[in-house]
C-alpha cells in the first residue's frame, strides 16, 4: 500500500464500500515538515475552500474524501509543490499528518481524483459561488462604493503535439506560438475574481462580451441594469474644466443625453489597448451600463504644458504626485473624458473613460494601478507554476465557429514578405542611382549593368507579388471549422481540470494575501510580508490533539528573526480567536509559536 500506510483497515473498508471516506485522526507529532501551512487553514476556509462540497462529490468507496483531496491540493500549492509528480520527492507521511490521515495520496491516485472532479464540470459554477462568497455584503462594508475590475488575457504556450491550436503572439518571448489564452478578472487589490478560457483567437472585447459579462451577471457583482435601482443621491463628479484651466468645452454632440452622466455605472472595466474599440465601449454602456477605463490609441497631438497641474494620486495604496490634465473629447461621435499624464521626459500618456462619477485623480490612480494584475501573473507563474498543464487530452470546438482561413493567412504572410523584398530591392536601386551621379563617366557602364540587374529583379518580385495577390483574392478570408481539413482543424486542450486547479490556486493566493496583510499590521514591512508567509509555510510545527477537550494545537517553530516571531505570535492569537474547526472534525484549532 506504500510508505507510511498505517490505516490499512480503513482502506479495505473504503474499497468495499463499507467504511466510507477516511475521517481525519490526529496523533501527537513534533517537527512536522511544512507544518506551518496549517497557519493558513483558517484563511483557506474563510476564502471558501469548502464551497467545493456544494458542487463536487467523491464516492464513499474512495479512501480519500473530498475534504482530504482539497486540503492536499491547497497545501501543495501553498508549499510550492507545483504538480503531483513532485510528491515523489516529498515525505508522504509528513503531508498525511497535515490532513489528518496516514499519508498523502500517491501520484496516480491524486491524478485520478483530479480527473474525477474535473469530469463533474462544475468549475465555472464554483467560480461564481466563490465570487458571491468573496464579495457578499456585510454590515460594516460600504456598498455605495463603485465596482472596478481589471481584465487582461494571459497567453499559455503549448509545446505538445496532440492539440492543434492557433498561433498567438506571446509578448514574453516576442514570438507567435501555439497557445491558449486565459482571460482573468481581478479587483482593485489585484486579487483574482474570475477566469474564463478562450477557445480560438478571440479578441479581448469578444471574451468580455461573450464570456466575462455573462458570468459576472450570474453573481452579486454585476446585476442586470433592470435589476439595479438607481439612487437619487448619486451625483456625477465635478466637471473636468473645474480641475484644470484651459480645458475644452463639450461640443453639441457631447452635451446630448447620449453622455452617460445621469446614471452611475454598475461597474467600470479597466483594460489595456488590446480591447480599444469605440463601438465596443458604446455597446458596453448602452447594453449593460458598464463604463470603461483604458489607454487611448493613436494619440498624435500634444496638449499645452501649462494645462497640466500637479495632483496627488493614490496608486496601489501609495501617494504619488502626477502632472495631470483633463479635457472632454468626442471620438467616433461618442463623448469621453480624456486624462493625460505629463512625464518628466515630456511624454503624454492618454487615458479615456466614459465614467462621469469618478474624479481625475481616481481615474489616473486606477488606470496606473493596473500593474497589480501584471504582478499577479508574474507571481503566479513563478510561485504556483501557473502555466502547468493539468490533464492531457483535447476536445472539439463548435464547428460553426469562424476562423481565419489558414491558407489565406499563409498567402497573406507570403505577400507581406514579398512586398518587403521588393522594397529592399528598390532601396538598393536608389542607392546605386545616387552613387552613379558622382561616378566618373568611364565607370558608368559597370553601374548601368548593376542597375539593369536590379530592375530585372524588381520586376520579377513585383510579378511574384501580383501572382500572390491574385491567388489570395480567390481564397475566402474566413471559414468555419467544419470547412477546415481534418488534420488542420483546430481543437482545444481540455479546459475543465485547468480551470478547477486555477480556482484552487485563486483561493490559495487570496488566503496567502490575507495572512500577508495581517503580518504587515503586526510590524512586517510590505517588502517582507510575503517572504514571511512563505517562511511560515516552510517551517516545521508540532501537532498536539486533545480528544477530551476537542482541540488541535499547532505550535510553529521559531522563524529567522525576532521581529518575525513577534508578528507570528500576534498572528497565532488572532487565528485562535477565529474558532476554526479542522474540516470534517469537531476539533477546535489553537495556534501557538515556540519563540519566546
Regions found by a protein language model. Give the residues of each.
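Extended alpha-helical coiled-coil "stalk/arm" regions
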Residues: 425-472, 476-479
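A short acidic (Asp/Glu
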Residues: 160-162, 277-286, 302-307
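An anionic, glycine-rich sequence signature occurring as long contiguous blocks
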Residues: 225-256, 286-373, 381, 549, ...
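Acidic, metal-coordinating catalytic cores used for nucleic-acid/nucleotide bond scission
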Residues: 269-279, 298-301
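Charged, amphipathic alpha-helical linkers/stalks
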Residues: 380-434
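C-terminal, active-site-flanking charged/polar segments
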Residues: 291, 359, 367-403, 461-468, ...
Amino acid at each position: 500500500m506504500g510508505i507510511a500506510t498505517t490505516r490499512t483497515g480503513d482502506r479495505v473498508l473504503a474499497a468495499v464500500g463499507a467504511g466510507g471516506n477516511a475521517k481525519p485522526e490526529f496523533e501527537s507529532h513534533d517537527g512536522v515538515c511544512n507544518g506551518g501551512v496549517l497557519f493558513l487553514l483558517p484563511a483557506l476556509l474563510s476564502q471558501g475552500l469548502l464551497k467545493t462540497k456544494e458542487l463536487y462529490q467523491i464516492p464513499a468507496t474512495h479512501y480519500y474524501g473530498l475534504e482530504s483531496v482539497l486540503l492536499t491540493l491547497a497545501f501543495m500549492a501553498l508549499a510550492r509543490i507545483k504538480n503531483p509528480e513532485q510528491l515523489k520527492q516529498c515525505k508522504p507521511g509528513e503531508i498525511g499528518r497535515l490532513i489528518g490521515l496516514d499519508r498523502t495520496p500517491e501520484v496516480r491516485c491524486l491524478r485520478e481524483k483530479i480527473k474525477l472532479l474535473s469530469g463533474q464540470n462544475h468549475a465555472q459554477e464554483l467560480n461564481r459561488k466563490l465570487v458571491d462568497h468573496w464579495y457578499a455584503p456585510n454590515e460594516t462594508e460600504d456598498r455605495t462604493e463603485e465596482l472596478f475590475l481589471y481584465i487582461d488575457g494571459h497567453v499559455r504556450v503549448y509545446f505538445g503535439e496532440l492539440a492543434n491550436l492557433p498561433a498567438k503572439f506571446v509578448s514574453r518571448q516576442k514570438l507567435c506560438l501555439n497557445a491558449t489564452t486565459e482571460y482573468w478578472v481581478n479587483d482593485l487589490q489585484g486579487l483574482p475574481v474570475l477566469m474564463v478560457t478562450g477557445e480560438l483567437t478571440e479578441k479581448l472585447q469578444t471574451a468580455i462580451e461573450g464570456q466575462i459579462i455573462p458570468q459576472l451577471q450570474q453573481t452579486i457583482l454585476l446585476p442586470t441594469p433592470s435589476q439595479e435601482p438607481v439612487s437619487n443621491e448619486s451625483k456625477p463628479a465635478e466637471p473636468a474644466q473645474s480641475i484644470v484651466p484651459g480645458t475644452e468645452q463639450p461640443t453639441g454632440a457631447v452635451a446630448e443625453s447620449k453622455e452617460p452622466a445621469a446614471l452611475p455605472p454598475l461597474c467600470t472595466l479597466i483594460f489595456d489597448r488590446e480591447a480599444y474599440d469605440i463601438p465596443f465601449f458604446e455597446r458596453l454602456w448602452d447594453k449593460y451600463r458598464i463604463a470603461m477605463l483604458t489607454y487611448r490609441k493613436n494619440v498624435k497631438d500634444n496638449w499645452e504644458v501649462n494645462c497640466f497641474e500637479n495632483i496627488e494620486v493614490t496608486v496601489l495604496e501609495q501617494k504619488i504626485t502626477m502632472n495631470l490634465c483633463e479635457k472632454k473629447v468626442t471620438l467616433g461621435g461618442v463623448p469621453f473624458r480624456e486624462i493625460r499624464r505629463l512625464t518628466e521626459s515630456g511624454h503624454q500618456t492618454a487615458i479615456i473613460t466614459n465614467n462621469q462619477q469618478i474624479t481625475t485623480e481616481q481615474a489616473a490612480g486606477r488606470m496606473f494601478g493596473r500593474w497589480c494584475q501584471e504582478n499577479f501573473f508574474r507571481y503566479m507563474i513563478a510561485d504556483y507554476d501557473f502555466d502547468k498543464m493539468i490533464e492531457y487530452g483535447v476536445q472539439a470546438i463548435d464547428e460553426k465557429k469562424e476562423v481565419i482561413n489558414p491558407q489565406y493567412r499563409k498567402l497573406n504572410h507570403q505577400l507581406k514578405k514579398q512586398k518587403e523584398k521588393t522594397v529592399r530591392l528598390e532601396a538598393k536601386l536608389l542607392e546605386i542611382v545616387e552613387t552613379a551621379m558622382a561616378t566618373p563617366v568611364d565607370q558608368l557602364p559597370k553601374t548601368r549593368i548593376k542597375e539593369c540587374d536590379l530592375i530585372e529583379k524588381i520586376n520579377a518580385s513585383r510579378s511574384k507579388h501580383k501572382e500572390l495577390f491574385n491567388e489570395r483574392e480567390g481564397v475566402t478570408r474566413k471559414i468555419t471549422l467544419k470547412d477546415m481539413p481534418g488534420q488542420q482543424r483546430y481543437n482545444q486542450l481540455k479546459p475543465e481540470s485547468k480551470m478547477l486547479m486555477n480556482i484552487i490556486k485563486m483561493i490559495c493566493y487570496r488566503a496567502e494575501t490575507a495572512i500577508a496583510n495581517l503580518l504587515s499590521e503586526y510590524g512586517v514591512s510590505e517588502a517582507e510580508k510575503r517572504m514571511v508567509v512563505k517562511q511560515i509555510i516552510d517551517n516545521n510545527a508540532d501537532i498536539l490533539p486533545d480528544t477530551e477537550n476537542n482541540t488541535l494545537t499547532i505550535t510553529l517553530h521559531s522563524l529567522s528573526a525576532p521581529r518575525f516571531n513577534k508578528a507570528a505570535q500576534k498572528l497565532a492569537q488572532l487565528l485562535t480567536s477565529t474558532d476554526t474547526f479542522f474540516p470534517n472534525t469537531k476539533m477546535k484549532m489553537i495556534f501557538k509559536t515556540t519563540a519566546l
